[in-house]
Amino acid sequence: MPWSQKAFAESINEDMYIFLKAVEDNNIVGYISLYKSFDEGDVVNLAVKEEYRRRGIATKLLESLIEWCKENGIGRLLLDVRESNNQAISLYSKKGFERLYIRKDFYDKPKEDGVVMQLKLANDELMESITTI
């Protein structure tokens, strides 16, 4: 769910958050944010202004974030998405994300289940060595 303006402002200056933006005609038309923790990252938000949707902006933002993660040692990405958000689930699936499990009643307004998805960026052998250290 989109963050409040206060939460967004507080996180933008924190080192553990990464923000990438899409700009058109000097206006921010979309952004994606990541919370990084060691070798993992949580995709916290992906948003595109309604009038700019269906132009591939979300895809480009997600691809750019995945590339940034690969270059910066992030081995796995996680995210939550509303179960009814078929467009987002389709985008994430096309980029290699897999469903892990359902979080019952995760979202409010309206109350809805969340789908937890992951994308492994490091191979399983590397991830296993990281988790067993």
Labelled PLM ranges:
Residues 55, 59, 112-121:
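Accessory recognition modules or surfaces
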Residues 54-71, 86-94:
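Conserved acetyl-CoA-binding loop-helix of GNAT-fold acetyltransferases
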Residues 35, 49, 53, 82-84, ...:
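Residue-level recognition of the GNAT/N-acetyltransferase active site
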